[in-house]
């Protein structure tokens, strides 16, 4: 859902950035100074406090940001925003991205245009609600791991370069047996990330759908499937596998799953509230990031 919102201004702004990304400390420092000049209260997430001089500012652990802030601004690339989403979504804290990465599908504002933030803080912006996935790895009756993903839940080969055999069920109905290098279960947000390189479709962010994208399937007729996002997906790892594959959520964590285990994926109960400038246009972003500009229609 994308809507233009006019509401009371954001006054308490938390800043977050990823260490080791070029230009992030400089942009964080400039952003801090700009926000102070706008008479906003600035809160630093603990890692951000290590990158800039925040001696006069409140420093807060990532999991406590909602108690002190009403907006989280992330400086970095899409990977930085993914990391921030894992922190902000359970707290239901809105997120705005400043792009210091390469693609920037999720981080809208260039570092040399920080003045765009002023209108957003005054309550003039577009708010986009994007859903996440929740993945659960089970072996027998034991829950081995559980996590959320803004982009994707991915079944990956184990340490040996071998195909994985697995069964796919949707809402407890058997779909197919597959032998492939893995499977990507992607949200619309993730459809322009790893799943795109695997031949998956681009899903508009407002679609309440997810796609199942096989990775290098043994059968040429295996193709991506788009399903209702309210579905529950179950992947059962065949007991015949002689290696243990991995399950990853947004590339953040990787968990081994034994043959015979199950991976359950469903829609997470909290969404991401992503903030954009009022002139944000999804198709403009696609044209720029996927190099469609040369074929842009003349209006």
Swiss-Prot record:
Localization per Swiss-Prot or TrEMBL: Cytoplasm
Q: Which domain of life is it from?
A: Bacteria
Keyword Plastid applies: no
Write down the InterPro entries for this protein, in alphabetical order.
ATP-NAD_kinase_N, ATP-NAD_kinase_PpnK-typ_C, NAD/diacylglycerol_kinase_sf, NADK
- EC class, as a word, reads transferase
Question: What EC number(s) does its UniProt record assign?
Answer: 2.7.1.23
Reaction equations catalysed: NAD(+) + ATP = ADP + NADP(+) + H(+)
Cofactor(s) for this protein?
a divalent metal cation
Gene Ontology cellular component annotations, sorted alphabetically = cytoplasm
Among the GO molecular function terms of this UniProt record, one is: NAD+ kinase activity
Q: Which PANTHER family match?
A: NAD KINASE
As for family, the record states: Belongs to the NAD kinase family.
* NCBIfam families linked: PRK01231.1
Task: Give the function comment from the record.
Answer: Involved in the regulation of the intracellular balance of NAD and NADP, and is a key enzyme in the biosynthesis of NADP. Catalyzes specifically the phosphorylation on 2'-hydroxyl of the adenosine moiety of NAD to yield NADP.
* Protein's name according to its UniProt entry: NAD kinase
């Amino acid at each position: 859902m994308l809507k233009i919102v006019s509401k009371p201004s954001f006054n308490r702004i938390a800043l977050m950035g990823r260490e080791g990304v070029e230009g992030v400390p400089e942009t964080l420092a400039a952003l801090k100074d700009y926000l102070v000049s706008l008479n906003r209260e600035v809160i630093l997430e603990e890692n951000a406090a290590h990158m800039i001089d925040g001696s006069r500012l409140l420093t807060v652990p990532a999991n406590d940001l909602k108690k002190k802030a009403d907006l989280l601004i992330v400086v970095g690339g899409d990977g930085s925003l993914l990391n921030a989403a894992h922190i902000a979504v359970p707290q239901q804290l809105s997120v705005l991205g400043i792009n210091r990465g390469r693609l920037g599908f999720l981080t809208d504002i260039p570092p040399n245009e920080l003045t765009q933030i002023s209108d957003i803080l005054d309550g003039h912006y577009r708010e986009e609600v994007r859903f996440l996935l929740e993945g659960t790895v089970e072996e027998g009756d034991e829950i081995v791991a559980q996590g959320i993903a803004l982009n994707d839940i991915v079944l990956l080969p184990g340490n040996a370069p071998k195909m994985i055999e697995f069964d796919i069920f949707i809402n407890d109905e058997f779909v197919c047996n597959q032998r492939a290098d893995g499977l990507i279960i992607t949200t619309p947000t993730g459809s322009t990330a790893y799943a795109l390189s695997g031949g998956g479709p681009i899903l508009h962010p407002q679609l309440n759908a997810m796609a199942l994208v096989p990775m290098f399937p043994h059968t040429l007729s295996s193709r991506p499937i788009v399903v209702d996002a309210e579905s529950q997906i179950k992947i059962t790892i065949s007991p015949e596998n002689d290696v243990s594959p991995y399950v990853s959520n947004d590339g953040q964590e990787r968990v081994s799953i034994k043959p015979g285990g199950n991976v359950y994926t469903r829609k997470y109960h909290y969404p991401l509230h992503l903030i954009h400038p009022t002139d944000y246009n999804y198709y403009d972003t696609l044209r720029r990031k996927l190099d469609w500009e040369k074929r842009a229609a003349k209006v």
